[in-house]
Regions:
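Active-site rim/loop-helix segments in enzyme catalytic domains that contact anionic ligands
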Residues: 1-119, 146-150, 241, 251, ...
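Metal-dependent de-N-acetylase/amidase catalytic core
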Residues: 1-3, 90-271
Length: 271
């Protein structure tokens, strides 16, 4: 079970493992907490600009999410329907109805109920405060951790993590391909961000080979066309995409299997 903040996060952060484990016959569940209302509108208009309709954006993004999950062969998709909170420096995050302001007792309770229903051996979500502090990502982390704690069902809890060298390799391969890195992520690649990424890298326990399903991850990303149609995600040459995104890396935060780390399989010790 992967607990995500917005439509498209399932593909960018865990598309490889979702596709790989689905191909291995493992039941996969994606929980998407928000509708992504504050994503781009038509012609990439931003929230607050003329032509941006949050409700229509949500409708479009949820349809794209369904398509992406079909490409990744996700067994079950669960959408919680909470309202996108927007970026950390946007005023929307202060609205009482957005996901990051919904009481943890409520949102974690809903995810805990899904954990009880599907009884996943492995639960995956984001890392806590660190390099990327989007309010909805932080809340999804809190919700998933609390759901795991309440139920005691997952044998393993993982946090999504990228290595500093992955970001540096991304920048190199984009330059080689003549693709300008937009902001974000260009604005994120500050010395402080890279320092935090290096700290995160030291905590990584698990590296999963996803080269065999990289094309499906890319196709799933392309399904989110309203957000990514001209994105570097989909413009990257095939060999560069495989080089940078042929692995997905995680921090094993909780474990009841006793399996040693480092490991190369989220299900190590469970089969």
């Amino acid at each position: 079970m992967a607990v995500h903040a917005h439509p498209d996060d399932e593909s960018s952060s865990t598309g490889g493992v979702l596709a790989r484990y689905a191909d291995e016959g493992i039941t996969t569940v994606v929980v998407t907490c928000t509708n992504g209302e504050y994503g781009d509108g038509p012609d990439h208009v931003k929230p607050g600009e003329a032509g941006h309709d949050p409700d229509q954006v949500a409708k479009t993004r949820l349809a794209e999410l369904e398509t992406a999950c079909q490409i990744l062969r996700v067994t079950h998709l669960e959408t919680l329907g909470y309202h996108d909170s927007g970026m950390a420096d946007w005023a929307y995050k202060d609205d009482g109805h957005v996901f990051s302001n919904v009481p943890l007792e409520e949102s974690a309770g809903r995810v805990a109920a899904l954990v009880e229903r599907y009884r996943p051996d492995v639960l995956v979500t984001y890392d806590g405060p660190g390099a990327y502090n989007h309010p909805d990502h932080l809340r999804a982390h809190e919700v998933a951790v609390e759901a795991s704690r309440r139920t005691g069902i997952p044998a393993k809890l993982y946090f999504i993590a990228r290595r500093r060298r992955d970001w540096e390799r991304l920048r190199e391969r984009m330059a080689e391909a003549g693709i300008e890195m937009p902001a974000p992520p260009a604005a994120m690649l500050t010395p402080e961000f890279l320092r935090r990424m290096e700290e995160t890298e030291q905590r990584i326990t698990t590296t999963v080979d996803t080269t065999g399903v990289a094309s499906r991850k890319r196709d799933a990303l392309a399904a989110h066309a309203s957000q990514l149609d001209q994105s570097w995600w989909v413009r990257f040459p095939d060999d560069a995409f495989l080089d940078v995104f042929g692995q997905e890396t995680f921090i094993r935060a909780e474990d009841r299997t006793g399996e040693p780390v480092p490991e190369d399989d989220l299900f190590a010790g469970l089969r």
